[in-house]
């Protein structure tokens, strides 16, 4: 399953160029309404043999941006795609983003 997120920005969003950890925090914070599930995803995930698999992946942020020093500045909107084979994960994120909003930082 996939979730497409479109966020209208009231003001420019300034992030470090390496912002992936911030997106992960946003995702795990949104999923924290189910602490046991969040803990499972973050600390264990699914395994097959000796390999462990995380149950979601996300795209880079898309939108109009400018690079300034070690930051990336997004203007007007950003878009993000999150994919997972777990329907519950996508539904939790969708509900959390719609009703709880998204905050970076």
Question: What function would you assign to each model-found segment?
Answer:
Residues 1-105:
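RNA-interacting cores
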């Amino acid at each position: 399953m996939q979730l497409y997120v479109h966020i209208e920005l009231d003001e420019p969003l300034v992030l470090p160029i390496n912002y992936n950890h911030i997106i992960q925090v946003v995702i795990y914070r949104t999923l924290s309404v189910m602490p046991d599930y969040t803990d499972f995803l973050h600390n264990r995930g699914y395994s097959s043999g000796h390999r462990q698999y995380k149950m979601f992946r996300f795209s880079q942020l898309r939108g109009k941006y400018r690079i300034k020093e070690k930051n990336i500045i997004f203007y007007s909107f950003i878009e993000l795609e999150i994919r997972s084979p777990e329907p519950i994960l996508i539904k939790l994120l969708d509900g959390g983003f719609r009703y709880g909003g998204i905050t970076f930082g």
